[in-house]
Every structure is written in structure tokens, then in C-alpha cells.
Amino acid sequence: MKIDSKNRLDIALLILRLGIGFLFILHGYPKMMGGIEKWAGLGSYGMGSLGIHFFPTFWGFMAAFSEFVGGIMVLLGLYIRYFSVLLIITMLVATCSHLVGGDGIMGASHAIESAVVFTCLFILGPGKYSVNINLKQ
């Protein structure tokens, strides 16, 4: 494959999706496999920082799901805009949790950076080299 001005953006999107998707699979897997206790703790910490104390297990599961399944979907480029929204919301909650928890901007920087990446993926879409594009053909 020759890199030229016609496919440069698509190759960059592929590299971005593969990298961030893989990392979110790694981050989300232990949370997803942690079960109910892990989800409840995650939900209590995350949503509790926003003053939301009901259904902590549900919120924790949603965070784990969005990171693990969202990572898979981003890696594949499948339904990327829907999963980008889930991941943006998850990263905004993580940002708030770090800031309220006293970690400061440096503690929240990973979540902020990830939210920026997923915002860009939401705007740009998956690119030409994705499962989503191949399903449409």
C-alpha cells in the first residue's frame, strides 16, 4: 500500500483506532471480568464523585462495557460513532472522578486525552480501512 495524499488520513485513522482500541481493551478487560463487586466499586467511585449514588453496579458495568467492548469496536472501526459517544461520557466521568478525588489535572490527563481522541474519532469516523466501511459495500 502506497502512502499518498489520498489515503494518508485513512492510514492515520487506522493506526489511531488500532492503538487506542487495543489499549482500551487492556484497560476494560479486568473491569469487565471483575464481576459485580468490581462494577459496584467502580460505579460508586465514578458516579459518586458526581453525587449520583443509585445503581452503582449498573454504572460500573457500563463503564467496564464501554471500555472493553468499546475498545473492540473502535479497533475494528465498527459503529465507531456510537461507541465514541459512550467512551467520551465514560472519560468525562473519569475526569470528574480524578478532579474531585484530588488527583488534579495530571491525574485526570489520561481521561482528558482519551476524551479528545474519541471526540476526533466521532467527528472523522472510522476511515476507509474499517469493518464498518466494508459492511456497507
Residue spans of the language-model regions?
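Extended, low-polarity transmembrane helix blocks
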Residues: 1-37, 54-65, 69-137
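Perimembrane loop-to-helix junctions flanking transmembrane segments
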Residues: 39-55
